[in-house]
């Protein structure tokens, strides 16, 4: 695993390059996991929202995301708040409404788990991966790439043990 080397090089300020591969924290599955955690920690993180709102697939397409953006801009809201308001005002197609509602409700549940300290940051990510369907998405597509992605996520969970809480982990990445 390259993560440990990357962490050490970053810590001592030594420049490095990964040949023939992608840096650990730049891998799609790691970015997805971090995006989930960032959005749970800070609902105003629109970049994280965009990355994960339809990952795994929730029937939330580009046109819906465009509508959310326009509504957010018009009403001076972040994307999550805009989504909530759009759901309340029935401004979302029925098929999309189901997926978006589930996503918003899940975020709320995960935040409550974190706030009420029902789960630490490591357990929280495990819960998110299971409840969001992200783990199932990777497991259901049997190929070497997805097996590697699952291994990378295990490595991320292991790396998170070095941090006392979600805030310190997010500051690090």
Enumerate the language-model features and the residues they cover:
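Conserved helicase C-terminal RecA-like lobe
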Residues: 2-15, 27, 34-173
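Short, acidic/turn-prone active-site loops that include or flank metal/cofactor-
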Residues: 20-24
